[in-house]
Amino acid sequence: MDFLHSAAPEPHRGRTKQILSLHPEVRTLIGPSPTTFWYIAGLVGLQFAVARFVADRPVWLIVALAYTVGAFVSHGLFVMIHECAHRLVFRRRLPNILTGLVANLPLFVPGSFSFQKYHLKHHAHQGVYDLDADIPSLWEARLIGHSALGKALWLLLYPIFQGVRSFRVKAVPPLDTWTLTNVAIQIGVNVAVYMLWGPRSFAYLALALFFSIGLHPLGARWIQRHYLVGEGDQETFSYYGKLNLLTFNVGYHNEHHDFPSIAWNRLPRIRAVAPEFYEDLAAHMSWTRLLFKFLFDPKLSLYSRMTRTSAAGDGPEPWGSDAAVATEGATAV
């Protein structure tokens, strides 16, 4: 078994050029959204408040709250870290790095700065095995196989697989000052939660993290983005269901890849301005339905990804210098 292969360039640069040619007003949407910082502050405060609340609550309530509340908060914070990676909270690099570290505080596992480094490579080299850490490793795909149990375990342990996978990308140094700072802060926060509030609060934060990207409707978001679940060779998919209201429009993934320097609260306007470019693309309407399809359809596996041998089409980005951080110009981050 192997991934699917394409000799064509990744699909987004070409579409971006076409959209800007026909709809130059899209450029007015480019730029950060500083009000995002207050959403981050609210989510961080809420997650720690719930963690404190469950300190002396029964285990069943802790699990229930982690699944129904904590998972959405943790997922929202992941989306906010993603915004920081693209410098979409503030314009300058340092405030976005620091804001990403704040968003990481309740997330149990340090990953804010590492995500920024590897995610920008994903945009610049979509589908290139040695540069795109979003592509599962071959050993990972072989280990998980096609069984529902294997795929369920993979989703449940996704943070671990993602962390190990990143070492495959030799172009990105795994350790640096900011990454180590992120690790040190997170260890300190986790120890403080355990010492001050006890093991149940600690467990709540851990469960919220794993539910947010695992066996939960939100976990299907990791499948929705680039897994080939339909006919044809479309390799990026958007989600237009109602949960976008609770997940900061993260489902608008084609739109995001076409314009990675447009903030989350303006992504729906891309499709509204240029509907002819998106109406014919396959899209998902239900993360829950997608989750079950991925788990129980034996034709779907970690091999259901499109790869390419070179980052065809690399070069200056068509949407202009304001978006440079989302490209190979990401070396500035």
Q: What label would you give each PLM region?
A:
Residues 83-99, 131, 136:
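Aspartate-rich (DDxxD/NDxxD/DxxxD) Mg2+/diphosphate-binding motifs
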Residues 52, 90-91, 131, 234, ...:
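Short, function-defining helix-loop hinge/capping sites that tune catalysis or transport
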Residues 77-86, 115-127, 221-230, 246-262, ...:
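Histidine-centered catalytic micro-motifs
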Residues 71-81, 111-113, 159-163, 206-232, ...:
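Transmembrane alpha-helical segments that form the membrane-embedded catalytic/substrate-channel core
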Residues 1-71, 105-204, 265-266, 271-333:
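Non-catalytic, topology-defining segments of multipass membrane proteins
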Residues 97, 101-105, 234-247:
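Membrane-cytosol interface motif
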Residues 57-61, 84-92, 122, 168, ...:
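Membrane-interface elements of multi-pass transporters and channels
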